[in-house]
Amino acid sequence: MALLAMHSWRWAAAAAAFEKRRHSAILIRPLVSVSGSGPQWRPHQLGALGTARAYQIPESLKSITWQRLGKGNSGQFLDAAKALQVWPLIEKRTCWHGHAGGGLHTDPKEGLKDVDTRKIIKAMLSYVWPKDRPDLRARVAISLGFLGGAKAMNIVVPFMFKYAVDSLNQMSGNMLNLSDAPNTVATMATAVLIGYGVSRAGAAFFNEVRNAVFGKVAQNSIRRIAKNVFLHLHNLDLGFHLSRQTGALSKAIDRGTRGISFVLSALVFNLLPIMFEVMLVSGVLYYKCGAQFALVTLGTLGTYTAFTVAVTRWRTRFRIEMNKADNDAGNAAIDSLLNYETVKYFNNERYEAQRYDGFLKTYETASLKSTSTLAMLNFGQSAIFSVGLTAIMVLASQGIVAGTLTVGDLVMVNGLLFQLSLPLNFLGTVYRETRQALIDMNTLFTLLKVDTQIKDKVMASPLQITPQTATVAFDNVHFEYIEGQKVLSGISFEVPAGKKVAIVGGSGSGKSTIVRLLFRFYEPQKGSIYLAGQNIQDVSLESLRRAVGVVPQDAVLFHNTIYYNLLYGNISASPEEVYAVAKLAGLHDAILRMPHGYDTQVGERGLKLSGGEKQRVAIARAILKDPPVILYDEATSSLDSITEETILGAMKDVVKHRTSIFIAHRLSTVVDADEIIVLDQGKVAERGTHHGLLANPHSIYSEMWHTQSSRVQNHDNPKWEAKKENISKEEERKKLQEEIVNSVKGCGNCSC
């Protein structure tokens, strides 16, 4: 029984962490057993058994755990039962709610259609040769000119050796005679050093100038592509981001942008120039030495290229495995560090290290395969080139014996082939790295092709709104996250301008969904939503979201200063305006007491601040935004009573003469609302003022109010435990069974 209680508590804590960390996978220690000697239930079995609905607890599990349930563990087990709903969702996402969790894709382009390589290259060339940047096109043209000069100088080098050797032979009568040492040394030094030195220096000069000129083109392309991807990701709808893990997405973008620079250089300065040089060398050999030399050269190069391409394609799968392992390792590290406190709570440092090491081991295995196959590729390339070079040299020696070629021709042929071997060796590397870079870039360009589900209509007009006209109206709105599971069923209500309206209801009634629909994170399947008398689907998203401020339940801050996070509400605001909203939110004095004042770093996700301080920052920056409409999505539900009262006092000053909608769980926070709307099963069940709704003792609101009030009283009443003892076991069992069944009606991760 103790084991059951321990795991129940762990599940409940894990469920809470899963709710908050919607962009990361939850780390939960496997369940060893339910209790005693009964059947053992593993996490994957829980997911497999829930066939009817992914979030349901199997009836067999309910029965077994109920039979082994002790009286003292009822509350803990109830929390655990709710948390059990999470397990199947980790395997497969069935809920797309605003803060729902689920199986996030470690592959950022999972479920997306790949972009063809030719389209990637075409898109790349559009950045290399931009129509709106003549200065960059001029740089590309100049770079190509320097490239041609460098290749020409490379071809000249073997000819320098040929003419030097031939002239020396002529001076000594067909045989190289070193009897006259001064003349010989002078002639060789002059011919080789001047010709070779000038050619090599010229080639190096052209290459370096080319790199310097083209550098701005490459960096500009990288910057523009990275910016476009980043902006596009922000424009995608919430559903896309809820199905992707942040760590994997970040790594994919990083690898893709790094691959851009390499592919740009490879396409413009390696692959095409190598092809040009191969044709040039083959033509020279055909003209100077005969068709046999050209055929052997082309045959060697063709075999070399075919072997390189075939082996590289085979090796590509190992790079894909490395990327996947790299993504998994990155996700594990980021998720574990973001959940630092949770790891400490359960003493799971070693478990996290072992889990992380498992991904690293997978990466190591794939990397070793890649390294060993690379050695095989390099040896094969060297063998093919050596065979071709040997054949060419044999043909050249036969030509010298026959008198059709000179010793200088032998030197020239050898020099041309060795000159060609440098880019050929690099060709293998370029092809391998280009293939790998294209794999990395595929995700980047695939993301750019993803179309958002929430977008402006053609020629959408900006929202015309003022605080005096900021009415909010829902007209027969129907909405469901998953087909067949309705969240809102024909809901209709209106919030007059400048009024405070509260929306309350039980879990799963659709309260938070209203916020997401009004902010257009989602579109209703039926019905319309109006703001200032205008259908929000007919106005631009930018103007709509500028007019609506949101104070979320879990305020997440940027890893920056307090001042930066406050200023984020309106980045053009003056320091005086920032200080004013901080005072209005009751935060100014607390900030001044900090060692660095407004320059205090808040830490990752604002974890250096208390919950109350984070909520006040969220309220302050919403005020700084100065929207006509403010939405409070259970903004104080996670705070203690004292902090809640302080923040509610600050809110009263904020909402004066401003349209405000409060999504509330604690009814005590909305007693002063102009109107309270009670939702039940996705419909407006009741509406009225606090006192008006309490006047009906059988109303849903009245029952909720008295239930919450009795909980507070019972919490402080020392006789409550004695009263519990008088409740019969049978009544307790029936009550708990009913609560368990009710707890699994929703998805368990959100308010649906």
Curated annotation (Swiss-Prot):
Residue ranges, Mitochondrial intermembrane side: 162-185, 281-290, 404-409
Main location per the UniProt record: mitochondrion
InterPro entries: AAA+_ATPase, ABC1_TM_dom, ABC1_TM_sf, ABC_transporter-like_ATP-bd, ABC_transporter-like_CS, P-loop_NTPase, Type_1_exporter
Localisation: Mitochondrion inner membrane
Residues given in the record as glutathione binding sites: R315, T316, R317, F318, R319, N378, F379, G380, Q381, G428
Statement: the UniProt record of this protein carries the keyword Transcription: no
Single GO MF annotation: ATP binding
Keyword Membrane set for record: yes
Topology term for the membrane: Multi-pass membrane protein
Chain segments annotated as transmembrane: 141-161, 186-206, 260-280, 291-311, 383-403, 410-430
All ranges on the Mitochondrial matrix side of the membrane: 23-140, 207-259, 312-382, 431-752
Resulting phenotype, E433Q: Loss of ATPase activity stimulation by [2Fe-2S]-(GS)4 cluster stimulation. Loss of the ability to couple MgATP binding with stimulation of ATPase activity at the nucleotide binding domain. Loss of [2Fe-2S]-(GS)4 cluster transport
Gene Ontology cellular-component annotations: mitochondrial inner membrane; mitochondrion
Domain ABC transporter: 472-706
Catalytic activity: (glutathione)4[2Fe(III)-2S] cluster(in) + ATP + H2O = (glutathione)4[2Fe(III)-2S] cluster(out) + ADP + phosphate + H(+)
Recorded disease: Spinocerebellar ataxia, X-linked 6, with or without sideroblastic anemia: An X-linked recessive disorder characterized by an infantile to early childhood onset of non-progressive cerebellar ataxia and mild anemia, with hypochromia and microcytosis.
Subunit structure: Homodimer or heterodimer. Interacts with C10orf88/PAAT. Forms a complex with ABCB10 and FECH, where a dimeric FECH bridges ABCB7 and ABCB10 homodimers; this complex may be required for cellular iron homeostasis, mitochondrial function and heme biosynthesis. Interacts with FECH. Interacts with ATP5F1A. Interacts with COX4I1; this interaction allows the regulation of cellular iron homeostasis and cellular reactive oxygen species (ROS) levels in cardiomyocytes.
The protein's role, per its UniProt record: Exports glutathione-coordinated iron-sulfur clusters such as [2Fe-2S]-(GS)4 cluster from the mitochondria to the cytosol in an ATP-dependent manner allowing the assembly of the cytosolic iron-sulfur (Fe/S) cluster-containing proteins and participates in iron homeostasis. Moreover, through a functional complex formed of ABCB7, FECH and ABCB10, also plays a role in the cellular iron homeostasis, mitochondrial function and heme biosynthesis. In cardiomyocytes, regulates cellular iron homeostasis and cellular reactive oxygen species (ROS) levels through its interaction with COX4I1.
Protein name in the entry: Iron-sulfur clusters transporter ABCB7, mitochondrial
Organism in which the protein naturally occurs: Homo sapiens (Human)
Lineage: Eukaryota, Metazoa, Chordata, Craniata, Vertebrata
